[in-house]
Amino acid sequence: MAQPDSSSLAEVLDRVLDKGIVVDTFARISLVGIEILTVEARVVVASVDTFLHYAEEIAKIEQAELTAGAEA
């Protein structure tokens, strides 16, 4: 079995930091119709520059949704 090439690992890490990865999770546990536990998580792996860029865009989307909801 061939060993993984360290340069390809560095390329993958560079790409992840450049583009970022977001894992958005929502889980609810209920027993007999009674909600016992709710877990909501958003995990972001990115460079600071990438995160700040996308955080600004997400804030714009959320603000537009709030404005549209207030007008309705």
UniProtKB/Swiss-Prot annotation:
The keyword Ribonucleoprotein does not apply. One of its GO terms (cellular component) is gas vesicle shell. It is found in: Gas vesicle shell. The keyword S-adenosyl-L-methionine does not apply. One of its GO terms (molecular function) is structural molecule activity. The gas vesicle shell is 2 nm thick and consists of a single layer of this protein. It forms helical ribs nearly perpendicular to the long axis of the vesicle. HAMAP family: Gas_vesicle_A (MF_00576). Gas vesicles are hollow, gas filled proteinaceous nanostructures found in some microorganisms. During planktonic growth they allow positioning of the organism at a favorable depth for light or nutrient acquisition. GvpA forms the protein shell. PANTHER family: GAS VESICLE PROTEIN A1 (PTHR35344:SF4), GAS VESICLE STRUCTURAL PROTEIN 2-RELATED (PTHR35344). Gas vesicles are about 100 nm wide and 200-400 nm long, and located close to the cell surface. This is Gas vesicle protein A. It comes from Haloquadratum walsbyi (strain DSM 16790 / HBSQ001). The lineage of its organism: Archaea, Methanobacteriati, Methanobacteriota, Stenosarchaea group, Halobacteria. The gene is gvpA.
